[in-house]
Amino acid sequence: MKVAWVTHHLIKEEERSDALLPGLYAGGAELNDAVMRSHQPTGYDIDVIGPDDWAQAMDYERVVITGTDRLSEEAMVQLATKSPLVWIQHAQQPAAARKHLFEKAAPFITMSRLHQAHEARWSRMSDEFVHSPVWDVNEVQPATKEPFALFAARNHPAKGKINARIKADALGVPLVELSNVDRSVVLEHMARAQWFIHLPKEFDACPRTVIEATLAGCEVITNAHLVGRLEPGDPREILTQQPPKFWSLV
């Protein structure tokens, strides 16, 4: 099946140190897209199409949309005629064309149960939810825990770095802050950290860092702005199920 994967979550053409994250991925959504595509079953031929070239997708057998932020109103209205799979990974800006796209999506997918409810306040309840996928569920393993807290996020005010400092001070524990460092460094610290603090200042839909901190055995401290966590159960088993779940809907 020929699949048009329409998104602005594009892999950078070259590694840059001045991006949101080092390496080829600007953030968690870019990683999510790349990981999900890496799990594609046989029989699918995927072309990644940027938002400015959306019209190319109209000729494809199946359309997958993983980012609507940079799609024009015309693009969303026209793409809606393809009954695309739409998988959104963060809070969406209410707009008539976007609501129409979600209504016509088959299916409309969010990141968690609470994310479903969040978007339903202005559009509709999503048909399904799919958590952030991982390349290897055994990549993140707990080590001997040490009495420090970890904050790891891209350098953005909404990620709540100041909130993390305040919380760590209230706990009376040292806080390690990691931004713009290689992912391997973050995972190594997660393995040892007793606490992972993520206190965002605005809506955050089931971020990868919280999932990875859960796999690392950290005590995750968050707030009401984090509206998504993994479903109850064995996190590795749950994450193993996410790519097959997604591709069964394509």
Please tell me what each predicted stretch does:
Residues 195-250:
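Catalytic binding pocket for nucleotide-activated donors in carbohydrate/polymer assembly enzymes
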Residues 44-107, 114-116:
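Extended catalytic core of nucleotide-activated donor transferases of GT-like folds
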